[in-house]
Curated annotation (Swiss-Prot):
<keyword id="KW-0588">Pheromone</keyword>
<keyword id="KW-0449">Lipoprotein</keyword>
<feature type="lipid moiety-binding region" description="S-farnesyl cysteine">
    <location>
        <position position="14"/>
    </location>
</feature>
<feature type="propeptide">
    <location>
        <begin position="75"/>
        <end position="77"/>
    </location>
</feature>
<feature type="site" description="Not methylated">
    <location>
        <position position="59"/>
    </location>
</feature>
<feature type="propeptide">
    <location>
        <begin position="60"/>
        <end position="63"/>
    </location>
</feature>
<feature type="lipid moiety-binding region" description="S-farnesyl cysteine">
    <location>
        <position position="74"/>
    </location>
</feature>
<comment type="function">
    <text>Rhodotorucin-A is a mating pheromone in cells of mating type A of Rhodosporidium toruloides.</text>
</comment>
<keyword id="KW-0636">Prenylation</keyword>
<feature type="site" description="Not methylated">
    <location>
        <position position="14"/>
    </location>
</feature>
<feature type="propeptide">
    <location>
        <begin position="30"/>
        <end position="33"/>
    </location>
</feature>
<feature type="site" description="Not methylated">
    <location>
        <position position="29"/>
    </location>
</feature>
<feature type="propeptide">
    <location>
        <begin position="15"/>
        <end position="18"/>
    </location>
</feature>
<feature type="site" description="Not methylated">
    <location>
        <position position="74"/>
    </location>
</feature>
<protein>
    <recommendedName>
        <fullName>Rhodotorucin-A peptides type 2</fullName>
    </recommendedName>
</protein>
<dbReference type="GO" id="GO:0005886">
    <property type="term" value="C:plasma membrane"/>
</dbReference>
<feature type="propeptide">
    <location>
        <begin position="1"/>
        <end position="3"/>
    </location>
</feature>
Amino acid sequence: MVAYPEISWTRNGCTVAKYPEISWTRNGCTVSKYPEISWTRNGCTVSKYPEISWTRNGCTVSKYPEISWTRNGCTVA
């Protein structure tokens, strides 16, 4: 399921496990370490990263080819 080998997270609110530069909680994905990615806690609203685009409803990736997940709590595919 995980296309990106350096990023690993669960299906419940996106729990990062392997990527050292990205850190967020399980409640709506709160970024704390990656300076180029910024989003709110309500369904992950990207505001700075041009290559990643998703909606506010559970994180819908639309531009990043190596990362794909559904709107229900971020399911990596």
